[in-house]
Amino acid sequence: VEGYKEFIKEHYEKPIREMEEYFPVICGEWCLFNSLACGHDTKGGQSVLNGMEEEDDRVLSDEERGEIYRELARAQLEAWEKGSGYFYWNYKLLTDTVNDSGWAGWDSWDLGRCVDFDWFPVKK
């Protein structure tokens, strides 16, 4: 997780802050999805729909997956908030990510699920 957070800070947060001094920066289409939380290399988001069906190299507990997503949500929001705004890629999943092993970790594409699972902070 630390590697992801360092990458976000260096390659997103810093440039956004610098560019925002000259023009508005809006981050489009981001989400919490990452291979770390899936337990295997998804090769940039390839799924069973693309014929990529791998057994998980490392099965994460719900608690481990949640901690990864919460940390990455904080890091990414901190970066995007240096700009003028952002759009979360809100793909509504209609798949069973619990009982279909090919979809383990993919809940993070769905903002509703991220909020329901307490991965994404909601200001009240």
What are these model-derived regions, one by one?
Residues 55-59, 63-124:
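Aromatic-rich peripheral "rim/lid" segments of glycoside hydrolase catalytic domains that contact
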